[in-house]
C-alpha cells in the first residue's frame, strides 16, 4: 500500500519532495484511520492488523525522512520528536499545557496560532528535535 508512491518520491533534498510527500502522508493518514477503525471491531482479521501495522510503519518511515529534510514542516518535526521520545499525543500535550487534539492537528498539517507554534517548537527542542 502506497509503496509505489513512496518509492517514486524524489530525494528528500529535492524542491518537489515536501509537496509530494505531503500528498502521500495525507493518504496514509486516511488509510491508517480506516484500518484502525476496522481493527477495533470485534471481527477484525489478522490481515487487517497486519495491514494497519504496515501502514503505520511506512508512515513513520516517511515522516522521519520528511522531518530530516530541508522542507520539514512543524507537524513532521513534532511527530518525529514525539515518536523518538516515545510519547503519546496526550503526554506531549500535557507537557506543554495544550490540548491533545492540537498536537494531532499540527501533526496532520493543520495550522496553529503563533503562541501554540512557539510552545510546540519549545517541546521539539526539549525533546532533542
Curated annotation (Swiss-Prot):
The keyword Ubl conjugation applies. There is a cross-link at residue 121 (Isoglutamyl lysine isopeptide (Lys-Gln) (interchain with Q-Cter in protein Pup)). Keywords: Isopeptide bond, Ubl conjugation. Binds 2-aminothiazole antibiotics, which are antitubercular agents. This is Uncharacterized protein MSMEG_6518/MSMEI_6344. It comes from Mycolicibacterium smegmatis (strain ATCC 700084 / mc(2)155).
Amino acid at each position: 500500500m502506497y509503496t509505489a508512491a513512496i518509492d517514486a518520491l524524489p530525494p528528500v533534498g529535492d524542491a518537489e519532495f515536501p509537496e509530494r510527500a505531503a500528498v502521500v502522508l495525507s493518504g496514509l493518514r486516511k488509510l491508517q484511520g480506516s484500518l484502525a477503525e476496522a481493527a477495533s471491531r470485534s471481527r477484525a482479521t489478522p490481515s487487517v492488523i497486519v495491514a494497519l501495522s504496515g501502514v503505520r510503519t511506512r508512515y513513520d518511515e516517511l515522516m522521519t525522512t520528511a522531518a530530516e529534510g530541508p522542507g520539514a514542516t512543524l507537524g513532521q518535526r513534532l511527530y518525529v520528536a514525539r515518536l523518538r521520545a516515545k510519547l503519546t499525543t496526550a503526554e506531549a500535550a500535557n507537557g506543554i499545557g495544550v490540548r491533545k487534539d492540537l498536537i494531532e492537528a499540527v501533526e496532520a498539517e493543520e495550522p496553529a496560532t503563533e503562541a501554540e507554534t512557539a510552545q510546540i517548537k519549545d517541546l521539539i527542542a526539549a525533546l532533542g528535535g
